Amino acid sequence: MREPLDPLGPALAQASLYLCTDARRERGDLAEFADAALAGGVDLIQLRDKGSAGERRFGPLEAREELAALEILAEAARRHGALLAVNDRADIALAAGADVLHLGQDDLPLPVARRIIGPSPLIGRSTHDSAQVAAAVAEEVDYFCVGPCWPTPTKPGREAPGLGLVREVASRATEKPWFAIGGIDEARLPEVLDAGARRIVVVRAITAADDPKAAARRLKDALVSR
């Protein structure tokens, strides 16, 4: 396992609430939203605009627009001591000075991504079955995500392995940080915690909330109480 460089390693180890958000182009409130969610206790914030309402209305987020949105998130993350993550794009992560690059199963090979972003940023991996989990535990990624726990509109057509995979990963007792992901909200969180997860990734549980700060705070309180 790669030893993360300080101060990112300790920040990741202590993180429990990871938020993926789109650029909120149809609302125009990214700065206000990010500040509220981070004030509520979000530890990592990732920009992921694929399949968003903004993409459907305005088209795919171009690199210049993505970097502008990431600068907004970076400023908010710095104010709140949180980590900034970029999805898929190692070049964008490098240009944005992101703390974290998150890779899916079909993204750049890990060694290539590492050469692009350099030694300091953290790299995470998505996993959807036992074999992918085993690979993520063995390879030099800094954390991995497990799921989806439930089907989710942000990943249409993807079969959800459910909480069974979460239980399996929890039974491994790996020291590498991992997050349960997929359809998790405040109502479902107790089931996820009962399955053995202690870190989660959420989307709509905060992005669709009337009060993002309060929604994040309730999730964080439930996580730290275990």
From Swiss-Prot:
2-[(2R,5Z)-2-carboxy-4-methylthiazol-5(2H)-ylidene]ethyl phosphate binds at T152, P153, T154, G183. It catalyses: 2-[(2R,5Z)-2-carboxy-4-methylthiazol-5(2H)-ylidene]ethyl phosphate + 4-amino-2-methyl-5-(diphosphooxymethyl)pyrimidine + 2 H(+) = thiamine phosphate + CO2 + diphosphate; 2-(2-carboxy-4-methylthiazol-5-yl)ethyl phosphate + 4-amino-2-methyl-5-(diphosphooxymethyl)pyrimidine + 2 H(+) = thiamine phosphate + CO2 + diphosphate; 4-methyl-5-(2-phosphooxyethyl)-thiazole + 4-amino-2-methyl-5-(diphosphooxymethyl)pyrimidine + H(+) = thiamine phosphate + diphosphate. 4-amino-2-methyl-5-(diphosphooxymethyl)pyrimidine binds at Q46, L47, R48, D49, K50, N87, S126, K155. Binds 1 Mg(2+) ion per subunit. Its cofactor is Mg(2+). Coiled coil: none annotated. One of its GO terms (biological process) is thiamine biosynthetic process. It is an enzyme of class 2 (transferase). PANTHER family: THIAMINE-PHOSPHATE PYROPHOSPHORYLASE, THIAMINE-PHOSPHATE SYNTHASE. This is Thiamine-phosphate synthase. It comes from Mycobacterium sp. (strain KMS). The gene is thiE.
